Amino acid sequence: MTQLTVKALSDEIGTPVDRLIEQLADAGMKKASSDNVTDEEKQKLLSHLKKEHGDKSGDAEPTRLTLQRKTRSTLSVNAGGGKSKNVQVEVRKKRTYVKRSTIEDEAKREAEEVAKREAEEAAKRVAEETAKREAEEAAKREAEDAVKREAEEKAKREAEEKAKRDADTNAQRNAEEKAKRDAEEKIKQEAARKEADELKRRQEEEAKRKAEEESQRKLEEARELAEKNKERWSAAEEKKGDMEDTDYHVTTSQYAREAEDEADRKEEAGRRNKKKKKPSTKDEQARNSGRSQRGGKGGRKGKLAKPTSMQHGFDKSATVAKQDVVIGETIVLSELANKMSVKATEVIKVMMKMGAMATINQVIDQETAQLVAEEMGHKVVLRKENELEEAVLSDRDTNAESVPRAPVVTIMGHVDHGKTSTLDYIRRTHVASGEAGGITQHIGAYHVETENGMITFLDTPGHAAFTAMRARGAQATDIVVLVVAADDGVMPQTVEAIQHAKAAGVPLIVAVNKIDKEDANPDNVKNELAQYDVIPEEWGGENMFVHISAKQGTNIDGLLEAILLQSEVLELTAVKEGMASGVVVESRLDKGRGPVATVLVQSGTLHKGDIVLCGQEYGRVRAMRDELGQEITEAGPSIPVEILGLSGVPASGDEATVVRDERKAREVANYRAGKFREVKLARQQKSKLENMFSNMTAGEVAELNVVLKADVQGSVEAIADSLLKLSTDEVKVNIVGSGVGGITETDVVLAEASNAIILGFNVRADASARRAVEAAAVDLRYYSIIYQLIDEVKQAMGGMLAPEFKQEIIGLAEVRDVFKSPKLGAIAGCMVTEGLIKRNNPIRVLRDNVVIYEGELESLRRFKDDVQEVKNGYECGIGVKNYNDVRVGDQIEVFEIVEIQRTLD
């Protein structure tokens, strides 16, 4: 007998030990993992598991018995040749015995199933017939109900229509009767009111008449009494003198005074009754009924009845109070409504009737506000916003006598034509060598003493970027000297200078420079200038032409004489005494001195300590310097000076005016700054709709953000204008910040936040700014010549342009034959007729010079060898990727895609 432990048995059958112990326990055998298990216990466990899993064949009586029988025998068979052979024969028999009760049970089950199916079918037929009958009955009932409902609804509709007609007829009849009754009632009430008014008027007249009669009667009685007692009173007068005379007047006038007082009281009561509001008919009836109710019981007569209506007796006037509305140049709609003492919605309604839409916070102009206020019946008082400014500027002492003044001469012309060199020779200095790159980048203002008088010169830049500077120079000048190089002739900035001079309406003197050069041609200059209406005097024109050489000093005196002669013709005068006024030629921010402005005095005398108003800035002049840097205390007309002490850097071209009161100057400056802000915001809001469609594609445009700092205001304007003109449809220059003065840490923070580059023109970054630049890795660049700055920005913009690609054909092959390859499909046997065929390049298949396929060259072979390229005149096999319809006579064109570096035009 084989015995195993529980643990070994679990390993053998692949069941966990704990699970096997539980199964043994369920079978009635408590075992541990180390206990032995006998064969009988195994059989018992197996029987238990079979029972548990529904297999009851273990202990059940077999219902079928199969018997197998096998018999063996030997059979002798004749094998031929007189021999016999024994053959083993085995007979197998198999017989199966089935228990009779099992057959009967199966037959019984089959009969039950047949009966059950027949019963179910019968029940199903009965149910179907029943459902069919019920459905027919339900349909019949629904049809009857539908007919019945339709009849009821028809009757109901007829009844409702009849009732509605009756109701309309009754309502119309009632309305007519009510209107008739109301009209009769109204007529009765009106008649009663008129009768009551007439009765009241007659009573008042009767009372007044009685009062007058009573007073007249008492007056007559007093007069009669006085006549009767006249003798007695005369005797009393003789005894008592003046005192008795007074008593007489008091005594005799007692009755008259009483009568007059009674008449006055009645008249005052009548006036009070007239002032009271006439009561309505209902209120009068209520008061009358109240009086009749109060008189019933004693002790309550004469008391006032409790009012039946809670409505006060004050009526708001229906007319609109007329207002004097003060309107400035602009006004907010809500403020206009407050000034007219009406709601803002009423103003909006009036504007809508006038054809204008507005919101409660919208700013409207003076003309619109005036029309609205007058439409609503108010008186309009128009007020100018710049009244204070006009008052301050008019309160100036400028009544002195005019005296001759020096001319202001602007030297203009193309770059490098010798403007500054001409002025240098006149001043006997060398200013040109001090300018970066040998070109003037500021407006230089100088005055020169000559033998024939003083002349003030303004030297303007000639570079294209300084258009605004040249325009300011032409506006502040009396005479323009146009310098033209005899070898170069008329250039673009020369033409622009002519246009500025004509726009300013100032005379033009042409100085033909560089006549000492071999290729100089002054006559050509005259011919070219004649095309722009600058005609020499010798040709019958009005313009003087002077041939000079700035380097040699040739005929410079002749130029000065021409200038003084022209100034004498103009008869230039100015007020020398009085408060000064002028124009800001240039301005900058000096690190040690603060805002510095170069002012050309045009009238009056500017003194140190004067209060100056310059555009949006103001201040007291703390110091004055001439063009040589020397301190001065006053400057007369046509003298350029640098002034210190302003509140900020003024804009070039602003008017500088001396005023009396610093407080008013500050108010005017603040008003101008606010006005500038309003105009700027209005311009931005106006451009929002105009730029809507361009802003929709703004994400596709590359932007170059720039923070610009320069030494003077004019350079900032010129550079900013030039950079903005570089913008194209693909790359846009965006100046996020600009200013005058050195580069500070704030500029670096702004550049870092906006991903911008910092451009410094003649300025440098301080120590903190340099540290911030290194920490933030911001691109900082310094420049001293403007065209170098513009060229580098143009290159940077070119690098931001999207690349452009071009297809370049490198080879052409002609298909001579077509082969089939099991791996690659159709292989074209080709002859290279042009250029070079390279592997893995894009190709086009041409048939009759028409492109029928574009793809990639997949296989290139020569003599069964894979090659990278095949040159002109050689044969090769070409496999086209994903294309098998190659025919003899086709052409295969091989090309390359080449990137073209783009630049700004």
UniProtKB/Swiss-Prot annotation:
Q: Where is the tr-type G domain?
A: 404-573
Identify the stretch(es) annotated as G1.
413-420
Provide the residue span(s) of the region labelled G3.
459-462
Give me the residues that bind GTP, please. Answer: 413-420, 459-463, 513-516
- Family stated for the protein in its record: Belongs to the TRAFAC class translation factor GTPase superfamily. Classic translation factor GTPase family. IF-2 subfamily.
Q: Which NCBIfam families match?
A: IF-2, small_GTP
- Spans annotated as G4: 513-516
Q: Record's CDD domains?
A: IF2_eIF5B, IF2_mtIF2_II, mtIF2_IVc
Indicate yes or no for the key word Transcription regulation. Answer: no
Q: Which UniProt keywords apply?
A: Cytoplasm, GTP-binding, Initiation factor, Nucleotide-binding, Protein biosynthesis
Biased composition of type Basic and acidic residues is found at 30-44, 52-62, 101-248
The main location class comes to cytoplasm
Q: Where is this region: G5?
A: 549-551
Enumerate the InterPro entries for this protein: DNA-bd_dom_put_sf (IPR009061), EF-G-like_DII (IPR053905), EFTu-like_2 (IPR004161), IF2_assoc_dom_bac (IPR013575), IF2_II (IPR044145), IF2_N (IPR006847), P-loop_NTPase (IPR027417), Small_GTP-bd (IPR005225)
Identification of the protein by name: Translation initiation factor IF-2
Ranges for region G2: 438-442
Q: What does this protein do?
A: One of the essential components for the initiation of protein synthesis. Protects formylmethionyl-tRNA from spontaneous hydrolysis and promotes its binding to the 30S ribosomal subunits. Also involved in the hydrolysis of GTP during the formation of the 70S ribosomal complex.
PANTHER family per UniProt:
TR-TYPE G DOMAIN-CONTAINING PROTEIN, TRANSLATION INITIATION FACTOR IF-2-RELATED
User: Which segments carry the region annotation Disordered?
Assistant: 30-316
The cellular location(s) given in this protein's UniProt record come to: Cytoplasm
Statement: the UniProt record of this protein carries the keyword GTP-binding:
yes
Which source organism? Answer: Vibrio parahaemolyticus serotype O3:K6 (strain RIMD 2210633)
Give any GO molecular function from the UniProt entry: GTPase activity
- SUPFAM superfamilies this protein is in? Initiation factor IF2/eIF5b, domain 3, P-loop containing nucleoside triphosphate hydrolases, Putative DNA-binding domain, Translation proteins
Gene Ontology, cellular component aspect: cytosol
